[in-house]
């Protein structure tokens, strides 16, 4: 029996190195795991730095675009006003203008100006007599006794203007007071 035990021990000792060798061949050592982890960390840091640089470049380009937009926002409107200025200068160069030709020139210039306003979404606020006072668009300059409903427009002193839907200048109005 001793011989059998001895053979079993020898067989076990022979199997152990083979099994241990096979296990070590498939399982990475701690040093290999550390090296792989360090490589992964380096790759992730590189990816992070590239993403950070890309975001910073995007932010910088967006800021430059906003700055450019602010700088040249009025360019289109200014181009529309140049013919108006040209018309006024030509009117001043006429040596002996007649009242009729001056009136015609002013009307044409006003049409050019209105076209520029319309194209750039600059809208007039001209309340009519009897319109309800709108504090978002009208500024009451005075209250006057009138034969109409209280808090309604009696007279428009000066037109107001909107750019798109934003108030540029309120219309100045006189308002009917309560009786």
UniProtKB/Swiss-Prot annotation:
Q: Which InterPro entries does this entry report, sorted A to Z?
A: GrpE, GrpE_coiled_coil, GrpE_head
Q: Which CDD domains match?
A: GrpE (cd00446)
One GO cellular-component annotation of the UniProt record comes to: cytosol
Q: Which keywords, in A-to-Z order, does the entry hold?
A: Chaperone, Cytoplasm, Stress response
> Do you know which Pfam families this protein is assigned to?
GrpE (PF01025)
The biological process GO terms on file are:
protein folding
Compartments where found: Cytoplasm
Q: Is this entry keyworded Kinase?
A: no
**Domain of life per record:** Bacteria
What NCBIfam families has UniProt attached to this entry? Answer: PRK14139.1, PRK14140.1, PRK14150.1
Known function: Participates actively in the response to hyperosmotic and heat shock by preventing the aggregation of stress-denatured proteins, in association with DnaK and GrpE. It is the nucleotide exchange factor for DnaK and may function as a thermosensor. Unfolded proteins bind initially to DnaJ; upon interaction with the DnaJ-bound protein, DnaK hydrolyzes its bound ATP, resulting in the formation of a stable complex. GrpE releases ADP from DnaK; ATP binding to DnaK triggers the release of the substrate protein, thus completing the reaction cycle.
Tell me, how does this one assemble? Homodimer.
Family to which the UniProt record says this protein belongs: Belongs to the GrpE family.
- Name of the protein in its database record: Protein GrpE
Please tell me the species this chain comes from: Janthinobacterium sp. (strain Marseille) (Minibacterium massiliensis)
